[in-house]
Amino acid sequence: MGVPAVRLIRFVTVAALTVLAMFACVGAAPAANAALQNKLDGSLAALWTSVLETPSAQNSFGTGGAEFNCWYLGRTVAPFDPTAVDSCTVRPGTGIFVVGHSFECSTFEGNGTTDAELRTCARNGDPTTPPTISVDGSPVPVTEAETPLLEITLPADNIFGLPAGTEGLSVAHGWVALLHPLTPGTHTIVITTGTSTVTTKIIVASP
């Protein structure tokens, strides 16, 4: 899913998101433990499933715009948009799923018909150099993540303009961080990919 605003197929998204409190719940980039890796892969899968199965009018990748670019995944929020997320306001205790970069491929977009084809497509969308993420000026470890083969059923008014109930497959790859909740106040997230830099504000409401 590509990022260009209206067309969001096979796109590279540099979405601004994240959270960091006193301690990051993510380890060094290449070597996340199995439990953490499963959680990161699962969070990326949940995020992309939400994007693909949410109607366009309520979708930041569709016609919904910035009003819908803070995605709620249980007790975690993921700022995620085809271009950039200016800010997300969250409750105290909310974790933030940070996507430094993600590329999605699906059968809806004609990117392939098998797990292997879609996975290769998603991996080919990687930037030459992994992104970096910082929170309030401090670097955050970034981990590579990849979804399992996702089985998607499109809603009415979906972002692809296909008939409601259309079924298909999707795989996404990305570089992410899952961090503990931030303290109340305003925090600055900076994601840098190559020469591109995106800044997002995370506003944690007072208890």
What are these regions (language model features)?
Residues V3-A15:
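Bacterial N-terminal signal peptides that target proteins for export
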Residues V198-I203:
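Edge beta-strands of extracellular beta-sandwich domains
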